[in-house]
UniProtKB/Swiss-Prot annotation:
GO cellular component: plasma membrane
Pfam family, one: TrkA_C
Biological process, per Gene Ontology: potassium ion transport
Membrane topology, from the record: Multi-pass membrane protein
Protein name: Putative transport protein YidE
Entry GO MF terms: monoatomic cation transmembrane transporter activity
SUPFAM superfamilies in UniProt: TrkA C-terminal domain-like
Length: 553
């Protein structure tokens, strides 16, 4: 059998063994995709014992391409919500998550200096302790750029594997410990979170208001300042028994009922200006109007602003809200449409059908993947990651590398959405498949390279010490920030658990947090809020640590 055929066969075996290990769960908790790393270590140990020779060049290419696939698909997935997560609504959560990353870096630096841990080893421990595989790839690349011998670079994968198991268990232990320390009642926390979502926050809500302000009588909607901006949409107007779709030129009268869509704070301001909220239903049921959700799939409208499509003037249809990548937005006229946007339309059936034809609304297109944008994005990402940035007194130029470059490019392209007829939307199933394929390839190679010396290092070497160092890097930041978030910020416990899981980019921890109260979405919401920024920082941090440690000796 040729070296290439043998290498492919061994990688397939690693994937099978690793995925089987990852699916084994104890009390609902398992290694997940991380099991592939240990599958690689097991197979790698026996490959080494048998004296088999694998194609090192092929392994290197597969490892790097797997990493690129993984980080690129992550960027495309979170890109639409990445920049939104940095705004005020998620600022506090992101600040605490960033603090966890910073403290983790400080603990790593202290351990490196106190115990004189070799640079590749300490970077591997750091990456494993925070269960972040792209950090491992980024660290290995910067070490190669710094001229580190390959046998030392491979040690990073071994120390990563030593620290990884407690990285998963440590965050679960932290959640449990914080629950005990603060005597948390999970049911109460879930109710408080739901109450806060109802009474405030950046959620999109709807209310029905009666026009009671005499100054508004016989004014056009466009002449009412609170209704003339982009913060509130008036999607229905009821006068006596007639329900209609209003336009900016529609004249309002005292006693009219308006159905408004917007954020709670803006709707409250509308009540102060227009009148009180009423319980009267403005449902389209039994009328000649209907509400329908339509998906944007027509390439001809991508990038166009809602106001430039003139749906109200041409079809007497109002867009009441927009859902983009799971985030509800007010359908501001200045919003540019992206592939996969879901619009709430209000109007007559025939008019809605006409607008749906303009927008596309072809559900089957949502399952198709445009491969051209995928490879354009990957190519641009690799180019971006290869651009050197020279810093005085640093021993090597800084680069985003094969982990950071594709990630940042994917975040940007995911945020842009489309350029002409090229769109970077990827169906969730396709995104997940490519992401899982990438991480399986990467971890398989890392495990294979580490397997030959893993057992000897664990039994006769410093493996146990590495596990201890990893436990400190995992636990100290999580416990410190968890206590600060609860005491100083009075953070909801379920929200805090999601934030802690997101700060470690750890899906098993999110699953554990979700199971604390299965019907509450608090943990998942905070996890998604901090995940994009933290993933970026986790990839950059080992590179900064490597250059810093190298430069100071």
């Amino acid at each position: 059998m040729s070296d290439i055929a043998l290498t492919v066969s061994i990688l397939a075996l690693v994937a099978v063994v690793g995925l089987f290990i990852g699916n084994v769960k104890f009390r609902g908790i398992g290694l997940g995709i991380g099991g592939v790393l240990f599958g690689g270590i097991i197979v790698g140990h026996f490959v080494s014992q048998a004296g088999m020779t694998l194609s090192s060049d092929m392994l290197h290419v597969i490892q790097e391409f797997g990493l690129i696939l993984f980080v690129y698909t992550i960027g495309i997935q979170v890109g639409p919500g990445f920049f939104a997560s940095l705004r005020v609504s998620g600022l506090r959560l992101n600040l605490f998550a960033v603090l966890i990353v910073i403290i983790g870096g400080l603990v790593t630096a202290i351990l490196h200096k106190l115990f004189d841990i070799p640079l590749p080893v300490v970077l591997g421990i750091f990456s494993g302790a925070v269960t972040n595989t792209p950090a491992l790839g980024a660290g290995q690349q910067i070490l190669r750029d710094l001229g580190t011998p390959m046998e030392m670079v491979d040690q990073m994968g071994m120390s990563y594997a030593m620290a990884y198991p407690f990285g998963i268990c440590g965050i679960l232990f932290t959640m449990w410990m914080l629950r005990v320390i603060f005597r948390v009642n999970v049911e109460t926390e879930a109710q408080q979170h739901e109450s806060s979502r109802t009474n405030g926050g950046a959620l999109i809500k709807t209310i029905n208001i009666r026009v009671e302000n005499l100054n508004l009588h016989d004014l056009a909607i466009k002449d009412v300042p609170i209704l003339n901006g982009d913060k509130i949409i008036c999607s229905r107007l009821k006068r006596e028994e007639t329900l209609k779709v209003p336009s900016p030129d529609t004249i309002i009268q005292l006693g009219d009922l308006l159905h408004l869509v917007g954020q709670p704070a803006d709707l409250h301001n509308a009540q102060l200006v227009i009148g009180q909220e009423v319980d009267t239903s403005l449902s389209t049921k039994g009328t000649d109007l209907r509400v329908e959700r339509v998906v944007v799939t027509n390439e001809n409208v991508l990038g166009k602003r809602i106001r430039d499509l003139h749906f109200k003037e041409r079809y007497d249809v109002v867009i009441s809200r927009l859902n983009r990548a799971g985030v509800e937005l007010v359908a501001s006229g200045d919003i540019s449409l992206q592939f996969g946007d879901i619009l709430n339309l209000v109007g007559r059936p025939s008019a809605i059908d006409a607008v749906a034809n303009v927008l596309g609304n072809a559900q089957q297109k949502l399952q198709q993947v445009q491969m051209l944008p995928v490879f354009i994005g990957i190519g641009l990402g690799v180019l971006l990651g290869s651009i050197p940035v020279f810093v005085p007194r640093f021993p090597a130029a800084l680069k985003l590398g094969l982990a950071g470059g594709p990630l940042i490019m994917a975040l940007i392209l995911g945020r842009i959405g489309s350029i002409g007829k090229l769109y970077w939307f990827m169906p969730p199933s396709a995104n997940l498949a490519l992401r899982e394929l990438g991480i399986v390839l990467f971890l398989s190679v890392v495990g294979l390279k580490s397997g030959g010396d893993f057992v000897n290092t664990l039994v006769n070497g410093e493996g146990l010490s590495w596990i201890g160092y990893g436990a400190l890097i995992t636990a100290v930041p999580l416990i410190t920030v968890g206590i600060l978030a609860r005491i100083l910020a009075k953070m909801n416990y379920l929200t805090m658990c999601g934030m802690l899981a997101g700060s470690m980019t750890d899906p098993p921890a999110l699953a554990f947090a979700n199971n604390l109260h299965p019907t509450s979405g608090a943990a998942a919401l905070s996890y998604a809020t901090v995940y994009p920024l933290v993933m970026f920082l986790r990839i950059i941090t080992p590179q900064l640590l490597a250059v810093l440690f190298w430069s100071i000796g």
